[in-house]
Amino acid sequence: MSDYILEIKDLHASVNDVPILKGVNLSIKPGEIHAIMGPNGSGKSTLSKVIAGHPAYSLLNGDILFYGRSILKMEPDERARAGIFLAFQYPVEIPGVSNADFLRIALNARRKFRELPELSPLEFFQLITEKINLVGMKESFLSRNVNEGFSGGEKKRNEILQMALLESNLSILDETDSGLDIDALKIIAQGINTLATSTNSIVLITHYQRLLDYIIPNFVHIMSDGKIVKTGNVNLAQDLEKHGYDWIKST
């Protein structure tokens, strides 16, 4: 098995025939937290969706390896069952589907892939009760429809709850800090830090350095015009906060 959870090699991708990713290279080992920053239109969110297998994006060149195996031919649901989790910038509402049913079905699909027995409703309730406390949610959220009527912070916490429950190997969090006040941000960050282990990896996609005040990444990558143009530690994010993205172009 590969030493890397994720390897992205010379990745080029487009949407509606417009090139967005123009040669992305990235390697992530177990236990690492990577932050990807960049201005609007730099390709950050596109990269996350291409990894997850979003059908709107066309792969032009390159490869994506998950534990050393290409996932390009895997459907999005196969990638999710294999252990790739994507938290959306704007989580969708699913009317008519309760949080509890959605989470139990998703968890059992993941367990089936891992050749583990499905959980009964009682076993699931015992597990979800443990996980729900992690993100400061009330049990009443389980009976509500998925994200329907949720505030922005509640939607983001619901995604972290999914991440906790599914125990994904690679979690990609696309602008999880977007629209959160400082109290909600701290709760989300605490949950993410608790879920970071020596065997999984987390990718944080963000515009702002403030998230990295609470979650310290091993690596910070700056994207510009569809490529990773600079890599460093958390100090790079702090420099970016001081000088802006034009500073990257001049270095």
Curated annotation (Swiss-Prot):
Localization: Plastid, Chloroplast
Molecular function GO labels: ATP binding; ATP hydrolysis activity
Positions of ATP binding: G38, P39, N40, G41, S42, G43, K44, S45
SMART domains noted in UniProt: AAA
Domain ABC transporter: 6-250
Keywords: ATP-binding, Chloroplast, Nucleotide-binding, Plastid, Transport
SUPFAM superfamilies listed in its UniProt record: P-loop containing nucleoside triphosphate hydrolases
Example of a GO cellular component annotation carried by this entry: chloroplast
InterPro entries reported for this sequence: AAA+_ATPase (IPR003593), ABC_transporter-like_ATP-bd (IPR003439), ABC_transporter-like_CS (IPR017871), FeS-cluster_ATPase_SufC (IPR010230), P-loop_NTPase (IPR027417)
Family affiliation: Belongs to the ABC transporter superfamily. Ycf16 family.
PANTHER family the UniProt entry points to: ABC TRANSPORTER I FAMILY MEMBER 6, CHLOROPLASTIC (PTHR43204:SF1)
Protein name: Probable ATP-dependent transporter ycf16
Organism: Porphyra purpurea (Red seaweed)
